[in-house]
Amino acid sequence: EENNISWSRQLEEAGCLVVYGIDGLKVHSKLCLITVKSDDGIQYITQIGTGNYNEKTARLYTDLSLMTANYEIGDEARKTFQEILIGNTIDRTQHLLVAPNSLQQPVIDMIEDEIEYAKKGEQSYIGIKVNSLTDKKIMDKLVEASKAGVHIDMVVRGICCLIPGVEGETENIHIRSIVGRYLEHSRIYIFGTKERDKIYISSADFMTRNTLRRVEVAAPVYDERLKERIRNMFSIMLKDNVLARTALPDGRYEIIDDGKKKLNSQEYFIEEAYKQKIQKLKYGELRKNMVLLQYQFSGGFLWKQ
């Protein structure tokens, strides 16, 4: 992109080493690694996102971003960058899922895990939010999971080659599309029930161009508070009866008329963001007043610089 070329030139002129990717593979991951060296050793601060570093689309797209000081995740991010630097792609990872070599198969393996739970008569669950779904291997595994009794909820905004609700095949798969003021762009993978779930945010849709022909990164979410937040977000999307359309076995999409109170998921998240902002402002004002009182009680003065 023209804008990328401009920034790359400016970075090079400033003395930065700019690597333009790998021949034959598009680098579509959204990955940033900050390495801090100190007397205590090396610390990594890693940011993994679902959306581009683009100030224009950031105002129009819905995305998720994770920042973590987890050393092992940071080290895998370092290895990912290291491989790209020499024109290779990373093969084995313990935490990150990195396409084209180690994303599709781990996803299939986690679907298989849910199949095994279902076969044992235990609760099983898969929740997926992507822009598009065309990867045949993943779709075949999801059908197998449905047949085994795994409950599968999917939010697929765009192209979807999987037909839900077919008796004996995909009757346990529920698919909806959400199209609203903002472009739904985040990718979320949830495998397992709340007590044992694995949750990832990702740059990759479930398309073979993403899983096999691009550099993509999916990051695990380990913090329980963040996992709960993502679960709640996904739950709200599944309750949306304003922007959402549900996919039918005949290929049509239908307006949701469930008789429940109208819920626009995008408006809900905006309202929640405003509430959090107001709470932070109130907290900041409270702290300022507490500092002022402390100075007054101590007989001091608080000067504004």
Which ranges hold each PLM region?
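Acidic/polar active-site rim loop that often engages polyanionic ligands
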Residues: R59-T62
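PLD/PLD-like phosphodiesterase catalytic module centered on the HKD motif
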Residues: E1-T57, M67-G74, P100-W303
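Short, compositionally biased "basic patch" segments
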Residues: N70-D91, Q105-P106
